[in-house]
Amino acid sequence: MLAEIKALGFDYVELSHGTKIVLLEGILRAVEEGMMKISSTHNFCPLPMGITHSAPNLFEPSVSATQEHAQWLRHTKRPIEFSARVGATAMVTHLGSVHFFWSNPVRKVKRYLRANPEIDPATDEGYRKILTKACNKLRNRIPAYWEQVQASLEEVRAYALEKGVMLGCENREKFQELPVDADYAEFIKGLDKDG
């Protein structure tokens, strides 16, 4: 795989959260031989044993449940180690999401869009009303999850610094993923512990 990328003229690659363990031997050989350099990796790279598909949200730093948090911590430190081993200076991670039990507001938004495929979401009043309600419900639930995300990142921060790996926080895929766009600047500012 890396030989093909090199043949296209690239010297650096980013390894994704879909990198399977069976590819590691070839990746490590390519790096050791100087054929390819790794610029960055993703959390859960390589994929944990038993996972065979791309899984950026396999474990989330926003979840406070002890067992899942322990898995997130374990499977975040491992890719940090791997990043350092292959010379990558950054590891990209997703920040988790807000969870809803029974009343996930996203369902209403999706239902409305499916029932009204012809509307323009930017101008349709019905859609805007449902979306505003969904955003308000999301906003009300964010604080507890957000605190957990920040605490989780703080748990791996020193380890990443020790290994010479920066943590990169990637954009969201879904409505309920963190951070919401309006909070991103404040989030980044809050990570600057050294001024």
Stretch-by-stretch model annotation:
Residues 3-11, 33:
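A short, Lys/Arg-enriched amphipathic alpha-helix followed by its capping loop at the start of a domain
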